[in-house]
A protein has these predicted regions:
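Positively charged n-region of N-terminal signal peptides that target proteins for export
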Residues: 1-4
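Ser/Thr-rich, low-complexity intrinsically disordered terminal regions
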Residues: 19-185
Length: 185
C-alpha cells in the first residue's frame, strides 16, 4: 500500500512540474552580422561610419547616439514604417518599428547587432493604437494586445516578423556591401 501511495505521489509530482519554454520561443527578435575586412581599427571605423550613413542612417528617424573612434563603437537607432496587409485594425496597427543598432569595431572585424525591435501603432485613431510592443521570435506576442483577438495578434506579429526580417537583412546586406566596397584599394 505504501509503495502504491509513493508511486502515486511521485507521478503526481512529475505531472505538476513546470514545463520549460522551447529555446527561442519567447526571446526577442535580433540580428547579428560579422564582417571581416583587412583594415586596422581606425580605417575600419571610418568605413563603418560611412556604411552607417549609407544604410541605417537613411532610415526615418535614424540617429547616432554614440560614436567613439578610439573605442571602435557606434550606437544608434532607427525605425521603419509599417502598414499591415491585414484588414482587421489596419489603421490602428499602422505605425513604426523602432530598433537599436550596435556596431563594434576591432582591427580586421566589424560586428553589427540589431536588437530591441519594438512596434508602435497609430495612437491618433479613434480607437487608439494597437501596439504589439517588442517583436519576439515566437508565435505569440510577449504581452496581451488590447483590441485584438489572439489569432489576429498572432497574424499581426507574424507579419511584423516577416517585414522586420526583410528590412533588417536588406540593411545588413547593404552595410556589408558598402563596407567591403569602400575597403577595396
Amino acid at each position: 500500500m505504501r509503495a502504491l501511495l509513493l508511486l502515486l505521489l511521485v507521478s503526481l509530482a512529475t505531472l505538476l512540474c513546470a514545463q520549460e519554454t522551447p529555446a527561442g520561443e519567447g526571446s526577442a527578435l535580433s540580428f547579428s552580422r560579422s564582417v571581416n575586412v583587412p583594415l586596422n581599427g581606425v580605417q575600419l571605423y571610418d568605413k563603418a561610419l560611412d556604411a552607417w550613413n549609407w544604410t541605417f542612417g537613411r532610415e526615418p528617424g535614424a540617429k547616432l547616439l554614440q560614436s567613439k573612434r578610439e573605442d571602435g563603437t557606434l550606437d544608434g537607432f532607427a525605425r521603419f514604417n509599417f502598414r499591415s496587409a491585414m484588414l482587421t485594425m489596419r489603421e490602428e496597427s499602422m505605425g513604426t518599428v523602432q530598433y537599436k543598432v550596435v556596431i563594434r569595431i576591432v582591427p580586421g572585424e566589424c560586428r553589427v547587432l540589431v536588437t530591441e525591435l519594438v512596434h508602435s501603432g497609430n495612437a491618433s485613431t479613434s480607437l487608439g493604437g494597437v501596439h504589439i510592443g517588442p517583436i519576439s521570435r515566437g508565435k505569440d506576442p510577449l504581452s496581451r494586445t488590447p483590441g485584438l483577438s489572439r489569432s489576429n495578434a498572432q497574424r499581426l506579429l507574424a507579419e511584423l516578423q516577416e517585414r522586420s526580417i526583410q528590412r533588417v537583412e536588406a540593411l545588413l546586406n547593404g552595410f556589408e556591401a558598402r563596407l567591403r566596397a569602400s575597403a577595396e584599394p
